[in-house]
Amino acid sequence: DFIKAGKPALAIDPLRIAAGVDVAAEALAWAEGHIGQGPVLVYSTAEPSAVRAIQGKLGSEKAGAMVEDTIAAIARGLVQRGVRQLIVAGGETSGACVQALGITQMRIGAQIDPGVPWCHAVAPDARDGLHITLKSGNFGSTDFFTKAFAQLQA
């Protein structure tokens, strides 16, 4: 597991987004300190009870949309800063990121796990290309993230 291995990881708090904090800018500032040293993880998942509490305060759709928009802004900011390898988890989040990145084409590449390949994408801020994988639902093994980046480095 990426986090258990001590890799750089940052949790996104939907309540801070709802309070008007520019969480995307904070995440990008944090990521800048790690870019070039290896993969980083920006995530928004939590224990089911915490998710229910947040959804109870904000509403399920609003909470989801805020997180998706924030992750999409972070993805775009990372690509603008030269990052050329992204893994996006979550179906709605994947769609938001593809849209925010302005991806116009994707070529299917090597399979990481059944149903989840690396893709080579064409996007305005990544004219030299972008390796991206869009992982939704329960696809992928428990070591998916580590395995995905190892595959690109092989």
Regions found by a protein language model. Give the residues of each.
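Active-site catalytic microenvironments in core metabolic enzymes, especially phosphate/sugar-handling
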Residues: 1-154
